[in-house]
Amino acid sequence: MDTHDTYLHLHSSPLNSSPSQPPVMSSMVGHPSVISSSRPLPSPMSTLGSSMNGLPSPYSVITPSLSSPSISLPSTPSMGFNTLNSPQMNSLSMNGNEDIKPPPGLAPLGNMSSYQCTSPGSLSKHICAICGDRSSGKHYGVYSCEGCKGFFKRTIRKDLTYTCRDIKECLIDKRQRNRCQYCRYQKCLAMGMKREAVQEERQRGKEKSDTEVETTSRFNEDMPVDKILDAELSVEPKTETYTESSPSNSTNDPVTNICHAADKQLFTLVEWAKRIPHFSDLPLDDQVILLRAGWNELLIASFSHRSITVKDGILLGTGLHVHRSSAHSAGVGSIFNRVLTELVSKMKDMQMDKTELGCLRAIVLFNPDAKGLSNSLEVEALREKVYASLETYTKQKYPDQPGRFAKLLLRLPALRSIGLKCLEHLFFFKLIGDTPIDTFLMEMLEAPHQIT
């Protein structure tokens, strides 16, 4: 496949028909290089919107301008920040009296029972009692947003259990509500959400099974899993034959090999995102923001699933097999072990298929908490559609595994935590300058980012 064809811009319709926009994004073909290799690197923002070494930027193909100060890389850690506070799930039981025990620090939040609507038109003025986002109404006894409503419902219906990796006092707000499921669930209970309301809703749903089937069908039509599978297959690298890498026979160290593979996969990531239903319908700036926010997790998920076919190592998109021993000798053994244990091994044990992988990656892509989005509610609605389609798919494809959907979602916190730790390593390698980092990966690392 021709390199330039792979990097076609995300929006298929002409973006420069308006005379007010500069005609710089109409085509990847013949895009001029504006920076020579002999000149010093430009500022991060100008780097992202330009090409380097005669090759176009992977993100210049999806937006006419990246110089807007409103665009930033969400949730990117810098050196010295602790990234191990990502939510993790385990077998800790949360049934019984513990369900209604509010976590420490929630008492001063006030009683939401006094927060009443004065008129039907004032409903939109309510805020979510859990995270402070815009409320969509009263759900399970509490004014809440669609995100917290869906989170609470999934927790109860799937009987999910969580644990807090901190001191059970995590801040739950619009920006950080997904960081700790344990504290988010406890806050739902503390604010008055009722478990029995979810169970009653399920019973009513059984009495209206025909309506539920129709709704599920509509969700599947809105977010068809076959389209998501097509997206995965369209960018799948040909790795029928691969080269083994070890300290004795590899000219490059594993970190260099991984960075080189990530650089190549950034282009296919753009092509993959274009094929995910409704992604191309989002504003171009939002598309850029979502890809910047999730590129590391999206790439890690891909090579982790690809690696279930090899033994004690990871299989890169370039066809190179990196052994565990090579990673340890390069000083990245700890994070390498986590990838193998928390991702590759789990995917292999449950025999995760390509459709399920694609849905998990789509969930990561549609991140409503990415900073700078023009409409986070729209992105959250798309994520909910992926949830619904994935749940329906697992029930139909694996009817003998009722807990499979929950097991799939359990991989997301681990993926998040590992993705943040990998970014820490990349920033370190970039800082010390010992590892060659290719053009497009460097652009992502130099993009403006914020710490959450």
From Swiss-Prot:
Residues 12-29 have a biased composition (Low complexity). One of its GO terms (biological process) is cell differentiation. Gene3D superfamilies: Erythroid Transcription Factor GATA-1, subunit A, Retinoid X Receptor. GO terms for cellular component: RNA polymerase II transcription regulator complex. Residues 220-448 form the NR LBD domain. A zinc finger (NR C4-type) spans 128-148, 164-183. SUPFAM superfamilies: Glucocorticoid receptor-like (DNA-binding domain), Nuclear receptor ligand-binding domain. Residues 194-217 are annotated as: Hinge. Disulfide bonds: none annotated. GO terms for molecular function: nuclear receptor activity; nuclear steroid receptor activity; retinoic acid-responsive element binding; zinc ion binding. Residues 1-127 are annotated as: Modulating. Residues 1-46 are annotated as: Disordered. Belongs to the nuclear hormone receptor family. NR2 subfamily. Homodimer. Heterodimer; with a rar molecule. Binds DNA preferentially as a rar/rxr heterodimer. Composed of three domains: a modulating N-terminal domain, a DNA-binding domain and a C-terminal ligand-binding domain. Receptor for retinoic acid. Retinoic acid receptors bind as heterodimers to their target response elements in response to their ligands, all-trans or 9-cis retinoic acid, and regulate gene expression in various biological processes. The rar/rxr heterodimers bind to the retinoic acid response elements (RARE) composed of tandem 5'-AGGTCA-3' sites known as DR1-DR5. The high affinity ligand for rxrs is 9-cis retinoic acid. This is Retinoic acid receptor RXR-gamma-B. The lineage of its organism: Eukaryota, Metazoa, Chordata, Craniata, Vertebrata. The gene is rxrgb.
